[in-house]
């Protein structure tokens, strides 16, 4: 169905708004994908914070002008599905990679993040990026590791000097006085 000018402007405005907020973009070839596969992918996209849309390349190209994804404009050729990660940079990569496992017709064509375009093979790299929660857990571990190592060193010194378990030794006199 052909879009009139006002509908095209709405599509461009919607995509431009999404592109301005997005962390990453993956454009994938989807020709031959069944309706059921697309429906499942759209459902998963909503759950993971990915904006997924099939739109004419000229409209997508206009929408990304002035954003960090403008570098991908010359590669927007052929029937493409656009996946913008809105919450986590790797979400679109994980979505496309997971959907491609059950659908050999779905192939990443463009991977863009941080104002740079990468080969389609980098979808695996993007998919392997940790989620926000995983990154925070890694950071917490890095921050607590020196304190943990210091506590272990103190305990080892106490045990080497014959003190045994310092906490248990301190608890014994308290138990005797009670």
Swiss-Prot record:
Top-level taxon in the UniProt lineage: Bacteria
Transmembrane segments: none
GO molecular function, one term: large ribosomal subunit rRNA binding
Family: Belongs to the universal ribosomal protein uL10 family.
Function: Forms part of the ribosomal stalk, playing a central role in the interaction of the ribosome with GTP-bound translation factors.
Quaternary structure and partners: Part of the ribosomal stalk of the 50S ribosomal subunit. The N-terminus interacts with L11 and the large rRNA to form the base of the stalk. The C-terminus forms an elongated spine to which L12 dimers bind in a sequential fashion forming a multimeric L10(L12)X complex.
Protein name: Large ribosomal subunit protein uL10
Gene: rplJ
